[in-house]
Curated annotation (Swiss-Prot):
Pfam families for the chain: 7tm_1 (PF00001), Ldl_recept_a (PF00057), LRR_1 (PF00560), LRR_8 (PF13855)
InterPro entries: GPCR_Rhodpsn, GPCR_Rhodpsn_7TM, LDL_receptor-like_sf, LDLR_class-A_CS, LDrepeatLR_classA_rpt, Leu-rich_rpt, Leu-rich_rpt_typical-subtyp, LRR_dom_sf
Entries under CDD domains matching the protein: 7tmA_Relaxin_R, LDLa
Repeat region (LRR), residues: 584-605, 608-629, 632-653, 656-677, 680-701, 704-725
The name this protein goes by in its record: G-protein coupled receptor GRL101
Residues carrying a glycan: 87, 166, 269, 318, 482, 502, 571, 618, 624, 685
Molecular function GO terms recorded: G protein-coupled peptide receptor activity
SMART domains, per the entry: LDLa, LRR_TYP, LRRNT
Biological classification of the source: Eukaryota, Metazoa, Spiralia, Lophotrochozoa, Mollusca
Subcellular location: Cell membrane
GO cellular component terms, semicolon-separated: plasma membrane
Residue ranges of every copy of the LRRNT domain listed in the record: 518-562
Residues making up the signal peptide according to the UniProt record: 1-24
C-alpha cells in the first residue's frame, strides 16, 4: 500500500507538471484591482452616486472602463467630426442641419441657417437659407417653405387627355376623382375638381371632359354614353339603333362601331373579305383592323380610326424627293405618289393602294392540298376557311363562303360561315352577319342568386364586376358598370375605382383596365431607352449578369432609385456615381463584380443610399473615405471579400447604419475604435474571418448593438473589457463559451456552457468535485488490491482469477482517468475558462478520453466474458467446455486489441472525429444530448449499442443461471434455501450495479437520438458519478466481498493479533508458523475453514450438475 501511495503521488506531480506547461487563450483576465476611491483627485466619476470611478486618463480613450460607458459617452467626449451636437447627450448628422425639420429636440439644428454652408454636391441653398436636396428641385413640392425651389422650372403643357394639377403637374384624365391621389398637391381629388361641371361621368366610374362628349370618339368604353343622343346624323353618317352617329365609311368595315353592331349586319356576302382591287386594309395597332374603301385613303378624313390621324392618312405627303431616294434612302414610292418607309416593303401587308409594295417580292409558297392560300400568298390550314375568324391579312379566307360545307360539329351562318354549335345563341355575335343570335329561344328566367344583364343574359354573381375572358360575364359588359364600391377578391387586381381583373392579366401586354392603363403601369420594360440592356420595373433597374464594364445610363430614367448591377465586370472609379441623377438612389447592388478596391469618394453624392451590397468581390481593404457620403446607409453587406485591413474612421460618417456584414473576410485583428461612428448599429457580423486578437474598445460606443457574431474565428487574444459599454447587447455568437464569460450578465451567448464547467472551474458542481476524487481513489486503490490479490491465482493457472485481473486492470484505468480530471480541476481552479480550449485540445485531455473509453469498454467486454464462462459452467457441468487459461489469454488478447482500436481510432486524425474527446471539459465522448457533434454516430455505436448488448447478455445470463441453479437445488436439497437466498442476493447485486451504471446512459442516449434534451446536471451526474460506478463496485463484488478473500483477511488478522499478544507476553515458543502441514485451532475453527468444508461436502453429496462455488465464493 505504501508503494501504491508513492506511485499515486508521483503520477499527480507529473500531471501537475504537464498542466503547468499548457498555454491557455489570453483573455487578459486580470486580478480585480481595488476600486479607485472617488474622493481621490484625478479620478472620473462614472455615475452620480459615485459607485464607480476610473482614472482620469481612461476618459475618452476608446475603451469603456465604466460599466455604463459614461467615460466614452457623448456627454463626456462630444460628437464626431461628421456630427452636430444638439445638447450634452445627443448628436445628429450634419446633413440634417437647416432642412426645415427640428431633428434636435431644442431646435438648435435649424438656427443660424443664413451662415450655414449646405453640403456641397448634394444640397442647394434657396432664398430662405434652408438646404434642399438637388433632386427635390422642381418636384412639384414646396420643400423650401417659400416655394422658391419650384419657381424656376420648365413645365410641359398637358395634352388634351390629361388633367392639369394646381401645381402644373399633368396626370391622366382617367385618374381624376378616382379616390387615389395622383397630383402631388392632391388637386385631382379635391372638391373643386370633382364637383366641377366641366366633366362628364361615365357609368364605369371615370370622368371625361365635356368637350369630349359627342365628338365622334367613344370615351365611355362600356356604355358609349358620351356618344348617344347627341344630334341628328348628317347625310354622310350612319345612325345606329342606339342613336349613335358614325361615318358611312365605317359601315361594313369589319368593326362594330355601333354598340349593337348594326353597322355590320347590312353587308353583302362579298364584303366579308378585303379584296385589294376595291378595299384598303388599315394597319391597326390596337384591336381588329378595319377594311375601308380605296377611295377613302388620303382623303384627309380619319377613316381607319386607329389613332389621332389614322393609318389611311399616313405617308400621304407628296415628297418631291421620294422618287430620287427610293429604297436606297429608306423609302418606297407608290404609284399613287405615297412614300412608304422601307420596312413596309414586302411585309405581306399591302400599303400601296393597289399593293405594289408586295408585288416584286419572293414568289409565294406553294400550298398543300390541306391548306388554303390567301390572296397575298400565305398558306393556312383548310379547316380555318370560313370559320368567322380572319386568318389571312386580306380576309380572303372569309370570302365567298355561301356554299361552304360545315363540319359535323359546326353550324352554318346565313352567310355560309361556320361556328361551333355551342356558340349558337350564346349572346355573343359569332357569325359575320349576326345570324347566330337571331330567332333564338326566349331568354331564360334568372334564378334568385343570379345577376341579369341588360341583354337578358343570366350570370353567376361571382362574375359581377370582374372582367374575365370573352365569354365570362355579360356579353354586353353590363356587369362591369357601377362597380366603384366592389371589393376585389384575393388574386384579383382592381382597376382603380372600377371593376376587377385577374392578377394574371396584369403586365401581360394587353390593356384590360378600359379607363386607363393601370394594369400595364409600372411593368417590366427594357431600359435604358433605346438600348435594351437592363430591365426596369417601377423604381428598379435590373442589369444583373450583363457583363457591363461601366454604368449603362448617361441620364437616369425618371423615378429609378433601385439599381441592381450585380454579377458584372464594373470598373468602379471615384466618378462612376458622381452624376447628379445618382443622388436619389436608395438601393445599390454591386455584388460579384470582381472589384478589388473601393476608391475614395466613390459614393460621396449618394447620401440617400440606404442599402449597399458589395458582397462576393475581391476587395482587400477599406480605406478612410471609401464609404464617405453614405450618411443615411442602413445596411452594408460586404461579406465574401478578401478584406485584410480596415483603416481608422472608415465608418465614422455612417451614423444610421443598422446592419454591417463583414463575414468571410481575412481580418486578423479588431483594433480599438474600428467601428467608431456606428451608433445605430444593431447587427454586427464579423464571423468566419481569421481574427486572432480583439482589443479592448473594439466595440466602443456601439450603444444600440443587439447581436455580435464572432463565430468561425481563431481568437487567442481578447480584452477583458471588450464587451463593456454595450447596454443593449442581447445575443453573442462565438465558437467557445470562454468568450461568454466576458459578456454582460443576461446576454444570450452561444455555444452554451458545457455540462461540467463554469467560467471559473472545470468542475462547477462541488458535490461532483468531491465525488470524482472519492470514486477515483476507490477505483484506483480497490482495483490495485484486486490485481495484487489475483496475481497469485493467475500464477496457479486459475482462469477465473485471470479474467478478474483483466477486469480490475480496466477499472484501475478508470481510476486513473478520474484522478487526471480531478487533478486538472484542482490546477485550473478559479481560472479555468482562460485555459478551456487549450485543455480540451491538449494531449493530456486526449489521453484521458482514450483511457476512459479503453477502461469502460475493457470492463464491459471482460464482464461479458466472465458471465459467459459462468453460464457455460452452469449449463454444462459435465462437459469440459470451460475456458482454459490459454483460451482465456487468447480471448482477452482479442478484447484488448479491439478496445484499443475503438479508443485510439478518434486520435488518428480523421476529420470525421474533429476533437472527439475534447467536446467537454471532462474529455468524455458520450452522446447523451441532441447535439449532432462530429463523430456522434461512432459514440452511439460504442457507448450505447455495444453496452446495451453487453448488459442484455449479462442480465439474461444471470437470470438463466439463477433459474437453473434453483431448480437443481429443489430437486436435491430442498432444505438449503439459505444458500439460494445468498446466491439470489449476489446475482441481484451483480445485475443491479450493471443496471445502475449502463441503463441511465443507454436510456439517455436513445432519448437524445429522438431529439429530447435532459437537464445539463443530469448529464454531468451520469458522466462523472454513474459511469465510473462499476469501476468502484466491481472490486467489492468480484473479490473483496468473497469468502476466500474475507477468510484470508481474517486469518492474517488473527496472525497479526497473536503475534501482537505474544510480543507483549514474551512467549515465543508457541508462535505461529504456517508450514502448510500444521493447523492451529483458530485456523481449524475459522469461518474460511468452515466454508471450505461445507463446499466439499456439497460437492460429495450433490449431483455433479450443481456447481455453485463460482457464483458466490469466487475463489
Amino acid at each position: 500500500m505504501a508503494t501504491m501511495s508513492g506511485t499515486t503521488i508521483v503520477c499527480l506531480i507529473y500531471l501537475t507538471t504537464m498542466l503547468g506547461n499548457s498555454q491557455g487563450v489570453n483573455l487578459k483576465i486580470e486580478s480585480p484591482s481595488p476600486p479607485t476611491l472617488c474622493s481621490v483627485e484625478g479620478t472620473f466619476h462614472c455615475d452620480d452616486g459615485m459607485l464607480q470611478c476610473v482614472l482620469m486618463g481612461s476618459k475618452c480613450d476608446g475603451v469603456s472602463d465604466c460599466e455604463n460607458g459614461m467615460d466614452e459617452s457623448v456627454e463626456t467626449c462630444g460628437c464626431l467630426q461628421s456630427e452636430f451636437q444638439c445638447n450634452h447627450t445627443t448628436c445628429i448628422d450634419k446633413i440634417l442641419r437647416c432642412d426645415r425639420n427640428d431633428d434636435c429636440s431644442n431646435g438648435l439644428d435649424e438656427r443660424e441657417c443664413d451662415i450655414y454652408i449646405c453640403p456641397l454636391g448634394t444640397h442647394v441653398k434657396w432664398h430662405n437659407h434652408f438646404c434642399v436636396p438637388r433632386d427635390k428641385q422642381c418636384d412639384f413640392l414646396d420643400d423650401c417653405g417659400d416655394n422658391s425651389d419650384e419657381k424656376i422650372c420648365e413645365r410641359r403643357e398637358c395634352v388634351a387627355t390629361e388633367f392639369k394639377c394646381n401645381n402644373s403637374q399633368c396626370v391622366a384624365f382617367g385618374n381624376l376623382c378616382d379616390g387615389l391621389v395622383d397630383c402631388v398637391d392632391g388637386s385631382d381629388e379635391d372638391q373643386v375638381a370633382c364637383d366641377s361641371d366641366k366633366y362628364f361621368q361615365c357609368a364605369e366610374g371615370s370622368l371625361i371632359k365635356k368637350e369630349f362628349v359627342c365628338d365622334g370618339w367613344v370615351d365611355c368604353k362600356l356604355t358609349f354614353a358620351d356618344e348617344l343622343n347627341c344630334k341628328l346624323c348628317d347625310e354622310d353618317d350612319f345612325r345606329c339603333s342606339d342613336t349613335r352617329c358614325i361615318q358611312k365609311s365605317n359601315v361594313c368595315d369589319g368593326y362594330c362601331d355601333c354598340k349593337t353592331c348594326d353597322d355590320e349586319e347590312v353587308c353583302a356576302n362579298n364584303t366579308y373579305g378585303c379584296p385589294m382591287d376595291t378595299k384598303y386594309m388599315c394597319r391597326s395597332i390596337y384591336g381588329e383592323p378595319r377594311c375601308i374603301d380605296k377611295d377613302n385613303v388620303c382623303n384627309m378624313i380619319n377613316d381607319c380610326r386607329d389613332g389621332n390621324v389614322g393609318t389611311d392618312e399616313y405617308y400621304c405627303s407628296n415628297d418631291s424627293e421620294c422618287k430620287n431616294f427610293q429604297a436606297a434612302m429608306g423609302f418606297f414610292y407608290c404609284p399613287e405618289e405615297r412614300c412608304l418607309a422601307k420596312h413596309l416593303y414586302c411585309d405581306l401587308h399591302p400599303d400601296c393602294i393597289n399593293g405594289e409594295d408586295e408585288q416584286s417580292c419572293l414568289a409565294p409558297p406553294k400550298c398543300s392540298q390541306d391548306e388554303f392560300q390567301c390572296h397575298h400568298g400565305k398558306c393556312i390550314p383548310i379547316s380555318k376557311r370560313c370559320d368567322s375568324v380572319h386568318d389571312c391579312v386580306d380576309w380572303s379566307d372569309e370570302m365567298n363562303c355561301e356554299n361552304h360545307q360545315c363540319a359535323a360539329n359546326m353550324k352554318s351562318c346565313l352567310s355560309g360561315h361556320c361556328i361551333e354549335e355551342h356558340k349558337w345563341c350564346n349572346f355573343h355575335r359569332e357569325c359575320p352577319d349576326g345570324s347566330d343570335e337571331k330567332d333564338c329561344d326566349p331568354r331564360p328566367v334568372c334564378e334568385a342568386n343570379q345577376f341579369r344583364c341588360k341583354n337578358g343574359q343570366c350570370i353567376d354573381p361571382l362574375q359581377v364586376c370582374v372582367k374575365g375572358d370573352k365569354y365570362d360575364g355579360c356579353a354586353d359588359q353590363s356587369h362591369l358598370i357601377n362597380c366603384s364600391q366592389h371589393i376585389c377578391l384575393e388574386g384579383q387586381f382592381r382597376c382603380r375605382k372600377s371593376f376587377c381583373i385577374n392578377q394574371t392579366k396584369v403586365c401581360d401586354g394587353t390593356v384590360d383596365c378600359l379607363q386607363g392603363m393601370w394594369d400595364e403601369n409600372n411593368c417590366r420594360y427594357w431600359c435604358p431607352h433605346g438600348q435594351a440592356i437592363c430591365q426596369c420595373e417601377g423604381v428598379t433597374m435590373d442589369c444583373t449578369g450583363q457583363k457591363l464594364k461601366e454604368m449603362p445610363v448617361q441620364q437616369m430614367e425618371e423615378d429609378l432609385s433601385k439599381l441592381m448591377i450585380g454579377d458584372n465586370l464594373l470598373n468602379l472609379t471615384s466618378t462612376t456615381f458622381s452624376a447628379t441623377y445618382y443622388d436619389k438612389v436608395t438601393y445599390l447592388d454591386l455584388s460579384r463584380n470582381h472589384l478589388t478596391e473601393i476608391p475614395i469618394y466613390s459614393f460621396q453624392n449618394m447620401w440617400k443610399l440606404t442599402h449597399l451590397n458589395l458582397a462576393d468581390n475581391n476587395i482587400t481593404s477599406l480605406k478612410n473615405g471609401s464609404l464617405l457620403g453614405l450618411s443615411n446607409l442602413k445596411q452594408l453587406h460586404i461579406n465574401g471579400n478578401k478584406i485584410e485591413t480596415i483603416e481608422e474612421d472608415t465608418f465614422s460618417s455612417m451614423i444610421h447604419l443598422t446592419v454591417l456584414d463583414l463575414s468571410n473576410q481575412r481580418l486578423t485583428h479588431v483594433y480599438k475604435n474600428m467601428f467608431k461612428g456606428l451608433k445605430q448599429i444593431t447587427v454586427l457580423n464579423i464571423s468566419r474571418n481569421q481574427i486572432n486578437s480583439i482589443d479592448n474598445g473594439a466595440f466602443n460606443n456601439l450603444a444600440n448593438v443587439r447581436l455580435i457574431d464572432l463565430s468561425g474565428n481563431v481568437i487567442k487574444d481578447i480584452g477583458q473589457k471588450v464587451f463593456m459599454g454595450l447596454p443593449r447587447l442581447v445575443e453573442l455568437k462565438t465558437d467557445s463559451y470562454r468568450f461568454c464569460c466576458l459578456a454582460p450578465e443576461g446576454v444570450k451567448c452561444s455555444p452554451k456552457q458545457d455540462e461540467f464547467s463554469s467560467c471559473e472551474d472545470l468542475m462547477s458542481n462541488h458535490v461532483l468535485r468531491v465525488s470524482i476524487w472519492v470514486l477515483g481513489v476507490i477505483a484506483l486503490v480497490g482495483n490495485f488490491v484486486v490485481i495484487f490479490w489475483r496475481v497469485r491465482d493467475f500464477r496457479g493457472g486459475k482462469v477465473h482469477s485471470f479474467l478478474i485481473t483483466n477486469l480490475a486492470i480496466g477499472d484501475f484505468l478508470m481510476g486513473v482517468y478520474l484522478l487526471i480530471i480531478a487533478t486538472a480541476d484542482t490546477y485550473y481552479r478559479g481560472v479555468y475558462i482562460s485555459h478551456d480550449e487549450n485543455w480540451k485540445q491538449s494531449g493530456l485531455c486526449q489521453f484521458a478520453g482514450f483511457v476512459s473509453t479503453f477502461s469502460s469498454e475493457l470492463s464491459v467486454l471482460t464482464l461479458s466474458t466472465i458471465t459467459l464462462d459462468r453460464l457455460i459452467c452452469i449449463l454444462f457441468p459435465l462437459r469440459r467446455t470451460r475456458l482454459g487459461l490459454r483460451q482465456a489469454i487468447i480471448v482477452m488478447s482479442c478484447i484488448w486489441v479491439l478496445v484499443f482500436l475503438l479508443a485510439v481510432l478518434p486520435l488518428l486524425g480523421f476529420s470525421y472525429f474533429e476533437n472527439f474527446y475534447g467536446r467537454s471539459g471532462v474529455c468524455l465522448a458520450l452522446h447523451v444530448t441532441p447535439d449532432r457533434r462530429p463523430g456522434w454516430e461512432y459514440s452511439v455505436g460504442v457507448f450505447i449499442l455495444l453496452n446495451l448488448l453487453s448488459f442484455v447478455l449479462i442480465a439474461s445470463s444471470y437470470l438463466w443461471m439463477f433459474s437453473v441453479a434453483k431448480k437443481t437445488r429443489s430437486a436435491v436439497r430442498t432444505a438449503e434455501s439459505k444458500n439460494d437466498n445468498a446466491m439470489a442476493r449476489r446475482m441481484t447485486l451483480i445485475v443491479m450495479t450493471d443496471f445502475c451504471c449502463w441503463v441511465p446512459i443507454i436510456v439517455l442516449g436513445f432519448v437524445s437520438l429522438a431529439g429530447a434534451r435532459a437537464d445539463d446536471q443530469v448529464y454531468a451526474w451520469i458522466a462523472v458519478f454513474v459511469l465510473p460506478l462499476n469501476s468502484a463496485t466491481n472490486p467489492v463484488i468480484y473479490t473483496l466481498s468473497t469468502a476466500p478473500f474475507l477468510g484470508n483477511v481474517r486469518k492474517r488478522a488473527n496472525r497479526f493479533r497473536k503475534s501482537f499478544i505474544h510480543s507483549f507476553t514474551g512467549d515465543t515458543k508457541h508462535s505461529y508458523v504456517d508450514d502448510g502441514t500444521t493447523h492451529s485451532y483458530c485456523e481449524k475453527k475459522s469461518p474460511y475453514r468452515q466454508l471450505e468444508l461445507k463446499r466439499l461436502r456439497s460437492l460429495n453429496s450433490s449431483p455433479p450438475m450443481y456447481y455453485n462455488t463460482e457464483l458466490h465464493s469466487d475463489s
